[in-house]
């Protein structure tokens, strides 16, 4: 006898909410998003307080600096979340947009039109910001969402979900369009992945372990990426002052996020001019550099010789691997071999 999935009630109400969303006008969804943003802004003090309790437990648990940074919500970050939802509200509504159209030789006219998926399962780890991001983007695109955040951010997510659902009750959108699974049980991930009668797609956001578990358990399509081995390539034709500022931002602003730079590639023709600038900036920022033989002369004795595994490592920390390459083709070959195809950049003035 097949066991009943305990999350079926959540799936059923989310499905009903997704059908109601189909009937809403773009302005009704935009208003709901603005109400959600206002609610988050008004509840900032409570959200930060609940997040502080999560932070305290994470510190006691010995979590590293990158993890704590992902978990942390400051008043400024809460305001950033609210503004983000307002920005999503202001975007053109994607539902009903014609992507392309064509006429067949037999006269049949075909249009490819954007439509909502239905119900999205969003599984993530320690970032409370994802609660608002996922809810806003799903609502804007006409989808209901069932959120399952990490147990480390349980209080934070509860506070955020409470605010978002309260805001929806003041709008034309059903509060069941945004639901949070908050038991903290590890079984919830497997159970959510098994809601194939209600979910249309699952989006996991987190580390390799989470992504692999979701991929293994899921009975619906999964939108995923595994790693964030991201590169900055500085070409010989780059504006070097701009390049060092881009590198600084890409590596040091949020080193624990998945789109932070992990490897710097420098054209050999620019190495003598650029690497001293990069070495000094990274030294000032407290970044540990792991360097290839060709780049080592430009770094001090504190630089560490790079090992083979460094080129494919997502550090999630103030660590940067550095390699000199022979032009853009060599750089692209390196990125294709070692990278994760997440977020890579080429800095050049030569189009």
Features from the language model and the residues they span:
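ALDH superfamily catalytic-core signature
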Residues: 5, 126-144, 159, 163, ...
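A structural signal for short, well-ordered beta-strand elements
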Residues: 22-23, 236, 324, 347
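Conserved C-terminal structural/oligomerization subdomain of aldehyde/semialdehyde dehydrogenase
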Residues: 117, 307-351
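Rossmann-like NAD(P) dinucleotide-binding subdomain of oxidoreductase/dehydrogenase enzymes
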Residues: 90, 98-237, 241
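Flexible, glycine/charged-enriched surface loops at secondary-structure junctions
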Residues: 24-30, 95, 171-178, 254-260, ...
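N-terminal Rossmann-like NAD(P)+-binding subdomain of aldehyde/semialdehyde dehydrogenases
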Residues: 1-110
